[in-house]
Amino acid sequence: TYAQAGRIVESSTDTVFDDAAAAWWTDTAANKSAMVVVDTASDAADVSTRCQHHLMVDGRLGDHVRDAADGCRIHIGDMVQTRRNTNEVLASDHHRILNRDVWTVTGVTGDGSLKVRHATRHATATLPVSYVSNDVVLAYATTIAGAQGRTVDRGHVVVTPRTTSASLYVGMSRGRESNHAHVVCDSHDHTEF
């Protein structure tokens, strides 16, 4: 079972975001792709910032280049997610920019636009300042909707009283190698999961 395999991790309301970000970092530092799935966009921004901090401490990120739509700071080397389909910008492979595409920030142009490389396609793009300011967020953590269709080596799901069993199922199926549930145990009995 997941419990016997150590894939259900007890946590508290106060520490669950730190715990999930630390687990994400352990995987990332081991050169595994990882993702944290949370209930809300606000939670995703919070956890993504914590994940980003681990990258900064390890020296994996460059200069701050722009602020994201959710208020998070974007640095060279950050993984970001586009949040709106647009025909205004085409990637180098002639595909349009899609909602939930994941990119790595590789540079910034003179006008402040972001140069990005797609996470799974061999494509690059330049995202205009206005698009970044309104439609780009950090991608280390995402909502259940944002996780659908995305697969990583190791998945982490923050389970709170708001998390539905359907959402938990989606979240716990994102990792190829393993999936872990970080369960808040101080405010709700999650025995139904």
Feature-to-residue mapping (PLM):
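C-terminal accessory regions
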Residues: 99-193
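Conserved helicase motor core of P-loop NTPases
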Residues: 1-115
